[in-house]
């Protein structure tokens, strides 16, 4: 159950990271509220997952999900570059996340 909660926390991290972009420095109300709620929920769920998972593993997986998810949405939604090096690097991060799950 802790792993499912951790994945949800990571997905919420993606929402708040993208929300930061759409909030324009917290100058737009609705994206700012969504961002702050997602931040709080993400950190709360991360802390809850850490009750059962090693802190280093949980934090690395959480940030990895956030980094990969945010980069993918940056490419898809925001028109950020999708170079081969970037895609391969995201694949390496994803492989690391999977490796941490398998090792714990």
From Swiss-Prot:
Residues 1, 49-54, 101-104 are cytoplasmic. The keyword Transport applies. GO terms for cellular component: plasma membrane. One of its GO terms (biological process) is monoatomic ion transport. SUPFAM superfamilies: Multidrug resistance efflux transporter EmrE. It is a multi-pass membrane protein. Residues 20-28, 78-81 are periplasmic. Belongs to the drug/metabolite transporter (DMT) superfamily. Small multidrug resistance (SMR) (TC 2.A.7.1) family. Gdx/SugE subfamily. PANTHER family: GUANIDINIUM EXPORTER (PTHR30561:SF0), SMR FAMILY PROTON-DEPENDENT DRUG EFFLUX TRANSPORTER SUGE (PTHR30561). This is Guanidinium exporter. The lineage of its organism: Bacteria, Pseudomonadati, Pseudomonadota, Gammaproteobacteria, Enterobacterales.
